[in-house]
Amino acid sequence: MDFILLAKAAVMGVVEGLTEFLPVSSTGHLILAGALLGFDDDKAKVFDIAIQTGAIFAVVLVYWQKIRETLVALPTQPRARRFALNVLIGFLPAVVLALIFGKAIKAHLFTPVVVASTFILGGFVILWAERRAPGAVRVDSVDDMTPLDALKVGLVQCLAMVPGTSRSGATIIGGMLLGLSRKAATDFSFFLAIPTLIGAGVYSLYKERHLLSMADLPLFAVGLLFSFVSAWLCVRWLLRYISTHSFVPFAYYRIAFGIVVLATAWTGWVHWGE
């Protein structure tokens, strides 16, 4: 396989890994990176979905101790069962709404104005959330969340169906606005990502299975590997970062990126559509 093509796959994997779990929208960045690299045909869209697997593996690795302890304790400890139930409850709203509205959203909302607007609006929402009263925090750990907390975060996650919103951004900032600490909101967002990304990925790959080929296996393997490594580094960095910093820098970045979306769409350089 062409070395240049494999290099492009590596770059796309890094972009996916670095942006999947930051509140900046991986989809928007993959579209822009694909346009820059000339890696934006139908097969590239399937590739973008497939390399999310690497990011999922990274989260599982970072949180493996918690996941393992929960699985072992499920038969005997109510606390473990409640945590697992919370993840399931948070996951279900996105499943239901995706099945009902997924096609309509892809057909009508993937436009430059919508993508740019959600980037910019999301930036201002982050600024607002970070300036809320310190006393608003009532949940310091994911283990202290109630099923209602999980349901609310799950409903907020549905906003990520709108292009440019960012799944991690919606769940983290939504969780903070609902009273979760920055750490608890981030942790739950990452746990929620595991079933959400697996479900969305399997469903999308099944629909586009006619575009898959064994000949592309090296391409997908390279992208997945680089996605895994970069996502692992990014998640570990973010967990350290949030202990002493806010999400404000990401807010300004989103606003700036929204302007980039409008500029590239206006010049015709990037096709922000399905």
Curated annotation (Swiss-Prot):
Q: How does it sit in the membrane?
A: Multi-pass membrane protein
Answer yes or no on keyword Iron-sulfur: no
Keywords, ordered alphabetically: Antibiotic resistance, Cell inner membrane, Cell membrane, Cell shape, Cell wall biogenesis/degradation, Hydrolase, Membrane, Peptidoglycan synthesis, Transmembrane, Transmembrane helix
Which GO molecular function, any one, fits this protein according to its record? undecaprenyl-diphosphatase activity
Instruction: Give the source's domain of life in one word.
Output: Bacteria
Q: Hey, which family's this protein in? A: Belongs to the UppP family.
Instruction: Extract the HAMAP family matched here.
Output: Undec_diphosphatase
Can you say what this protein is called?
Undecaprenyl-diphosphatase
What organism is the protein native to? Paracidovorax citrulli (strain AAC00-1) (Acidovorax citrulli)
Q: Which gene encodes it?
A: uppP
